[in-house]
Amino acid sequence: VDLAGKSFLDIGFGQGLALLLAAEMGAEVSGIDNDAANLKALESTRAVFGVETMPRTLIGSILDKDFLQKIAREGRYDVVHAWGVLHHTGDMQQAVRNAAGLVKEGGTFICALYNRHWSSPVWKVIKRTYLRSPQALRKALIVVFYPVIYSAKRIVTGAHPTQTERGMDFYHDVVDWVGGYPYEYAGAAEVLRWVCRLDFECLRFRAARVPTGCNEFVFRKLRPRPSLSNSKN
């Protein structure tokens, strides 16, 4: 996706990598996140990148109607980017609809969402247990699942598990996975159905590398189809 001169919204900007990379590529960037603590993380990343101006950011939930109205009043975006975040909101389908609603006609919606797998409900219980457990039990769960996740990833991908693409070491990757809750998931066909009903077409799709990983989508916003009543007039 060519970002030069485009308006770019990053949903769940976190430490700000996508936000700052988009700025480097010439986009006019904005970011939203539900956690105000990520402003400090973004500031640290900005210093590493050597970016002089702090990107425009807002703190709020993609599920908050008042917050969405505030964003929409300022206009929709050429590119809306929501990478691996909407499945942690507690209402993934609504979050997808809300995020897609911020895209201009002809604009691009980029998202990554956890894939549905037979083991997904099991992981949901594990993640909920981790969240509700004292620190000692959390550490024990990481010790138990570290070799399980290590072996599964090695078998499925054929790659060394410590060679990650996420910018964190494998141990913290395991902590992030086991502790990532709320946790929702959907098959690729489900996501395509949700988004295409909103007058989008899918330009690119990449299946999850591991069964419970993220399916990756690039959609383009189409012009709304005329209703039958309008076409008769």
Task: Briefly describe each language-model feature range.
Residues 81:
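A conserved beta-strand element that flanks and buttresses the S-adenosyl-L-methionine
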Residues 17, 21-64:
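Class I SAM-dependent methyltransferase SAM/SAH-binding core
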Residues 206-231:
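Core SAM-dependent methyltransferase catalytic element
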Residues 1-5:
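Conserved alpha-helix/loop element of class I SAM-dependent methyltransferases that forms part
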Residues 182-198:
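Short alpha-helix
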Residues 6-12, 108-139:
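Conserved class I S-adenosyl-L-methionine
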Residues 93-105:
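A short glycine-rich, Lys/Arg-flanked "PGG" loop and its adjoining helix->strand segment in the class I
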